[in-house]
Amino acid sequence: QAVLISEYRRIVASDVLNRVIKPVILFKTVKNTENIDNLYKDFIKLIENLSVNEINEIFEKSTLEAILKLKEKVEDINSFISAIKYGFRKDSCLVIHSKIKDKEEKLKYLNSLENPKNPIRAIFAVDILNEGWDVLNLFDIVKLDEAKKTANSTISEAQLIGRGARYFPFEY
């Protein structure tokens, strides 16, 4: 559903505000790097194999207002699926964690997400990007696991929510 809501934001910005935006989703876990690598692979497979039946099932079962409004906006479901497959293709997704080989190169992408030429729409991260990182077009944060609650994790979660729970940062 996060991908569909992200697409809804993109479509509304285009239709209502006449602006091209690139909403970014952060998929975050505190578990091991192998777990995030597998989640990334599963996500890519899900996007590549996305079908009309799957989208229709989400549209029919969802009670989220954004999904219901998106359903009304989608005129051609095949074009909509093509847009998702293009927007979230393999080279538009980034995996980052402490053990990644090309971490410095990936950090350059992360620090230029607002650049229209930067293709990244989804980030898969393991216990990284916790402090001092702010991106105007990061609208959705998907927590992929439940960790034990500590005072530090509660503060970290509040900071994370603060990054994702923002108003549309552009004038309209």
Can you annotate each of these PLM segments?
Residues 21-23, 136-140, 155, 172:
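Short glycine-/polar-rich loops that comprise or flank the Walker A/P-loop
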Residues 35-36, 133-134, 169:
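Short helix/loop capping segments that flank catalytic or ligand/cofactor-binding pockets
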Residues 39-47, 139-145, 156-161:
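Short secondary-structure boundary/capping segments
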Residues 31-33, 129-131, 146-150, 165-166:
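Conserved nucleotide-binding/hydrolysis micro-motifs of P-loop NTPases
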Residues 123-139, 160-164:
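SF2 helicase motor core recognition
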Residues 148-171:
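Conserved SF2 helicase motif VI
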Residues 5-125, 150-153:
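Conserved C-terminal RecA-like helicase domain
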